Amino acid sequence: MSNYDFKKIEQFSQSLWDFSSCDFQRKKYYVLSMFPYPSGKLHIGHLRNYVIGDVLARYKRSQGYNVLHPIGWDAFGLPAEKAAINSNIHPRIWTEKNIAKMRTSLKSIGLSYDWSRELSTCSPKYYEHEQKFFLAFLKAGLAYRKNSEVNWDPIDKTVLANEQVIDGRGWRSGAVVVKRKIPQWFLKISDFSEELLKGLESLTGWPEKVKTMQTNWIGKSEGAVIKFSISGYEERFIEVFTTRPETIFGASFCAISVNHPLVNELNLLSNAEREILRIQTTCESDHYDDNKNFSGTTNLEKVHEQKLGILTKIKVKHPFSGDELPLYVANFVFAEYGSGAIFGCPAHDTRDFAFAQQYNLPCLRVISAKCTNTALPYCLEEGVMCNSNFLDGMQVIEARKFIIEKISSIGIGEAKNSYRLRDWGISRQRYWGCPIPVVYCEKCSMQPVKVEDLPVTLPEEVEFTVQGNPLEHHPTWKYTNCPKCGGPAVRDTDTFDTFFESSWYFAAFCSKEGGIVKESCKRFLPVDMYIGGIEHAILHLLYARFFTRALNKCGYIDIVEPFRNLLTQGMVCHETYQNSSGEYLYPEEAKSLLEKGEKVLVGKIEKMSKSKKNVVDLEEIVSKYGADAARFFILSDNPPENSFGWSDRGINASFKFLQRIKNLVERYLSSKNSGEVQTGQNVKIQINKIICDMTKYMDEIKLNCAVAKIHELVNLLSASGALSKETIHVLLRILEPFAPHLAEYLASKLENNVILYGSPWVAYNEVLTQSDAVTLMVRKNGKFVQLLEVKKDSSEEEIISQAKRLIKNAVVDKVIYVPGKMVNFLCSSPG
């Protein structure tokens, strides 16, 4: 490593770069990696996300684009409050220190960010604008307040996010968490359900997996609502939603959610029964919270192991037969899906069948299968209707259409689509977030803060040792005057969900002025390439799509889809290590034990995680191997979308390869006074083909294949000796996006006063790529002998025969032939 002083090279190259320049005459390209939470430390997993974006940004600049490549900080959130509690440090100070540290780390790896656009979501200059958005949403009817069920810690007297509930207890107090309804703010994302669903069709640059996950999350169901009258209650109905209205004659019961209005109106449950069902029913507010898995499956789709129902005192009447059916309150019916009520047809629904079996309810088959399938439940939408009165003899789809027309004509129902997507609850009972800009006045009720009085900022002096929300208990902050009457009022002490900040930051980057500047957004939006983990496929990406539509509706921007293309990079994985007691070890701890001769169990390669201690510290890697080696290796082995296995051997190999490039270029520089070497036609064709392939792979973001082409070019130049200013420039130009420091440094040695960053990409001759010849390397025992040009349609035997002439009389023991690449003769006699 002695002759590759990467620290000196990094310092030199970074002093040359200016990433803030813009040329609005050029076509724009906006590349954005999801901005980080300032936790204080970057690991290798972060590196992959940001380097992918940087490679694309550098490549697009070299193609002449006006590239927007910004960075910022998703700076609000719970960890800062935890730090305040555990370490007695103010969240703002903790966050600012972490940002400073991470900013230094990001700059050290040569990321070409326009730092003049840097933003932090915890800055009042940033969140002032989202307070304005909220007021606009309120005026447009997109924001509202209602009671909603939450996790309540009775000791700390505060609302807990799901991740703060551990085994049913509060993370801080250890108290048993209870469900409680409190007023919460919501955004009407459900109003955009169909639009969000249809919009996915236009996102041809998104992975199909992500679009499928969002489709499932939105959860469109086509069906009908049908009214069942309540026996003994004149003019009272239960509206039932069903996706299978044709099975109405197989109904043997109805069921409603524990949160259905009738439960309270008709006093259907005792307190004990209500609590039993609440415990057995997945908390409906969990459907949209911070820590969901990202399978795209909602709680509404989950099938409970136990179908629990409590039989009520009332019955409902079948809308056609008039038969009385029992009414249950059941744990598998959700208030905010459909109508919060269902009819059960056990013969043709798996869930209903399980419920009927448990409660001994009738099971009447109303579809006769064409096949010999007589087992119940029969859930296919195929067959002929039977036991169904006027529907008998119809095919299932025909009967469905007929029954919908029937219920519509007699006024007991209609066709209806239902969506699982629920409104977004944006209230959080936390200090470290954006204050909600409303006040409450006894005389005037809820009133929005005047725009000229924004931003509503957080108080600096807060006490985190008291129970509950620090804003709620602040002695002065929450007391203010009503914007309408001027009388005493109280501020809303909730803050926005942190997804609020990340739902529009991409638009804020378009202008250095801050906020959303419509003309700047017209220039840069939508984002051309958005890069981040697939764990954000549902919540963040769906919220951002909704938020863009809401901003469009309120006149802020003209687009409705924020991200034209999406790349979900794979996880970075690493071996796990355990000591003899089974405790996980950090890699450096495992190395230390091995050096002492102690036993270390090496486990499988898994996603890097703090819990398994298989994380690799980015600063240590950069300090030991340099930024370029880390960048180069992280993109080498697998496509960006696939998982990547980190290894010491791999990073060391990348370091040595870059050192080899440096030596190769310096060899040329030291010999160029002897005169330029003329590059032969065969080598020119080979280089031309490499440039062509490299360009194709960069356009397709097959970055691992592009890295392979860099290796191929280095091998070609080394073997052929075709070192010239022209060929070295080609090498450095295609190397620059991946290893920018070394490429820039060597380019400065190749030609004075030339900056490689932003210089044009190397061109290739299309005619030469169409050549009917191919050039192969001929090797003997792995060592380069000569290049051999052969016709593309030559057989393997012909190629080996021609190549063999180049090794003269050597005794060949084995031939290794790689089509289109190489012939290697393994010889026992030198010949």
Swiss-Prot record:
GO BP term (any one): leucyl-tRNA aminoacylation
Localization terms from the record: Cytoplasm
One GO MF term: ATP binding
Keyword Electron transport (UniProt): no
Predominant place of localization: cytoplasm
Motif extent ('KMSKS' region): 607-611
Keyword set, alphabetical order: Aminoacyl-tRNA synthetase, ATP-binding, Cytoplasm, Ligase, Nucleotide-binding, Protein biosynthesis
Alphabetized Pfam families for the sequence: Anticodon_1, tRNA-synt_1, tRNA-synt_1_2, tRNA-synt_1g
Motif 'HIGH' region: chain residues: 36-46
Reactions it catalyzes: tRNA(Leu) + L-leucine + ATP = L-leucyl-tRNA(Leu) + AMP + diphosphate
GO cellular component terms listed in the entry, alphabetical order: cytoplasm
EC code: 6.1.1.4
Sites where the protein binds ATP: 610
PANTHER family per UniProt: LEUCINE--TRNA LIGASE, MITOCHONDRIAL, LEUCYL-TRNA SYNTHETASE
Family: Belongs to the class-I aminoacyl-tRNA synthetase family.
Name of the protein: Leucine--tRNA ligase
